[in-house]
Amino acid sequence: MERSVTAGKWLAYCRLMRIDKPIGSLLLLWPTLWALWLAGGGAPAPWTLFVFVAGVFLMRAAGCVINDYADRHFDGHVKRTASRPLPSGEVSEQSAKILFVVLVLLAFGLVLTLNKMTIWLSVAGLVLAWVYPFMKRVSHLPQFVLGAAFGWSIPMAYAAVSESLPATCWMMFLAYICWTVAYDTQYAMVDRDDDLKIGVKSTAILFGRFDNIIIGLLQFSMLALLLALGNITGLGIPYTISLLVAAGMFIYQQILTAGRERDACFKAFHNNKYAGMAIFIGVLFGL
């Protein structure tokens, strides 16, 4: 009995960190890998790669914990999130705060092995990660803050590999923000009806009936920025092909979300992990 209770508690912590749902980690991992390879013109040092991959999973977990803590009084009123560990009472608020601190300290401990520029940038990244969940209370644009928070691994990667932040770094960062706003709007479309009832703000609500048009414009902007970046850095035909593959996936997503059905919007959101992977393959073979 005691063992089963303990096992249940651990499973609740895993669910709080979304270990059972790696989609968010993948959406953060792929652009981090784009940046690591492009910053150095090839594979980064093994330790640098380890720090960033581990950091992605740790900070994504920390982000999920602080997000659920911020939403603890709202999630119980939303069909998709009512069974999460905090609103269901499986994990206490105090335990969630402790877990967040532990995850952040582990990630920061890894960053301390890198150069000073990367360490200072990580502090700004932590602030962005902390601010994002609370933006849903005051602004319809929390997805832009999420894009900056998730995309902050890009300047950190450039700093770690080359100790510089060239224009191409910020082009990639801006492209990633466009992509994040697009895919997280798809995600927000799933909860739009519930969010309207409880007063949570999102780009899905702000964009209204123009949601798919604006998502398409954001996806186009992302691809245009990445194409320009590829031309500047001399990436070859494989990279261009990868962008065409990603464009095909974005068209598929538009077809899925045309009816604005919950399951279809969620499927479109998940499809983005393949777009990110395709672009990374293009970077690998284009260098």
Swiss-Prot record:
Keywords: Cell inner membrane, Cell membrane, Magnesium, Membrane, Transferase, Transmembrane, Transmembrane helix, Ubiquinone biosynthesis. It catalyses: all-trans-octaprenyl diphosphate + 4-hydroxybenzoate = 4-hydroxy-3-(all-trans-octaprenyl)benzoate + diphosphate. Pathway: Cofactor biosynthesis; ubiquinone biosynthesis. The chain crosses the membrane at residues 23-40, 98-118, 141-161, 163-183, 213-233, 235-255. GO terms for molecular function: 4-hydroxybenzoate polyprenyltransferase activity. It comes from the Bacteria. Its EC number is 2.5.1.39. The keyword S-adenosyl-L-methionine does not apply. Its cofactor is Mg(2+). Its main location: membrane. It is found in: Cell inner membrane. InterPro entries: HB_polyprenyltransferase-like, Prenyltransferase, UbiA_prenyltransferase, UbiA_prenylTrfase_CS, UbiA_sf. Signal peptide: none annotated. It is a multi-pass membrane protein. GO terms for cellular component: plasma membrane. Disulfide bonds: none annotated. HAMAP family: UbiA. Catalyzes the prenylation of para-hydroxybenzoate (PHB) with an all-trans polyprenyl group. Mediates the second step in the final reaction sequence of ubiquinone-8 (UQ-8) biosynthesis, which is the condensation of the polyisoprenoid side chain with PHB, generating the first membrane-bound Q intermediate 3-octaprenyl-4-hydroxybenzoate. Belongs to the UbiA prenyltransferase family. This is 4-hydroxybenzoate octaprenyltransferase.
